[in-house]
Amino acid sequence: MLKRTLVANRGEIACRILRACREAGIEGVAIFAGNDSGTLFTELADIAVELEGDGLAETYLNQEQILQIAIENDCDSIHPGFGFLSERADFAQAVIDSGLIWIGPSPEAITKMGDKMTARITMKEAGVPVIPGEEVDGGLQEVLDVAPSVGYPLLLK
């Protein structure tokens, strides 16, 4: 059973996670940048810790600082929310390697789903329906040749 979860996010998603923690009897730890001081998610937390630094890279994306705060506050788990560090396989692995519980997809799943082509192949292999598409390495004529089988409107990337 989890006892204390650090929420590595801010705003509405942090509020939702902190409320869910409270309902489950889990203490919630919020991290916040200086400009988020006094906002609702910091008020909902059992513990709120201000991040050092300016800007996202030094605060909400600073993996080492966030892990250190979790450890110093006796957290047993980290919930990333979405965005920010939730899509970073290296952060998920660092959380696991530090002995904490990562509340999210495995680092392997994050890696597979982070690359669109790998995600598409993985989903097809798992029998999940995917939107028709083609990987085209040729020129305009190849695009024109496969376009009818893909369907319109056609998005090129």
Task: State the predicted function of each range.
Residues 1-156:
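N-terminal beta-alpha lobe that positions the nucleotide/phosphoryl donor
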